[in-house]
Regions:
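Conserved phosphate- and dinucleotide-binding cores of soluble alpha/beta proteins
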Residues: 5-165
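Contiguous alpha-helical scaffold segments within structured protein domains
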Residues: 1-2
């Protein structure tokens, strides 16, 4: 999408997810939401990027409801994306506001998808979800592996510790 439209040039048929008017750049493409769900459900997406409240060591994804009584649950198309995309990448902060890891042994929030996450991008590391467990691909400068493992609280292994097949 392009920049916000000039005052008076808004086209309210062209809005973003926050219902704000947007512009498009040359070559942009968009289509009806029914077509987007057909693409998701038909397995036509190579990958998608989603946010998350929690990701389990098995790659389970919880991203639509924390169970908080004042929160309005909002699945949207996340379940379709989580199951329909060939690879699911998650982008999230590594820790909650209270300092707990969002990467958990088992999700405690309602699941969006089971064993669907391929890779986790956080503010501290890049972690692949593999059949052998969580594999740390990259860590931010200044943070050691042992400290990352302590903060995460679930078993991690370095990418260079792969078991030979």
């Amino acid at each position: 999408m392009g920049p916000a439209p000039a005052a008076g040039a808004e086209d309210y048929d062209l809005i973003n997810a926050g219902k704000q008017p947007v512009t498009i750049l040359p070559g942009a493409c968009f289509f009806h939401h029914a077509d987007s769900f057909a693409m998701m459900r038909g397995g036509h997406l190579d990958y998608c990027v989603l946010g998350a409240f929690q990701v389990s060591v098995a790659g389970d994804l919880a991203n639509w409801h924390t169970g908080a009584p004042d929160a309005i649950p909002a699945v949207g198309g996340a379940m379709d994306l989580a199951i329909g995309a060939k690879q699911v990448f998650v982008m999230m902060e590594h820790l909650t506001k209270s300092g707990e890891s969002k990467i958990v042994e088992q999700c405690t929030y309602p699941l969006t998808g089971v064993a669907c996450v391929s890779r986790i991008y956080t503010d501290l590391a890049v972690i692949d979800v593999t059949a052998a467990g969580l594999e740390v691909v990259e860590i931010i400068d200044g943070l050691g592996f042992d400290e990352l493992a302590r903060l995460t609280g679930v078993p991690l292994r370095r990418a260079d510790q792969r078991v030979a097949a």
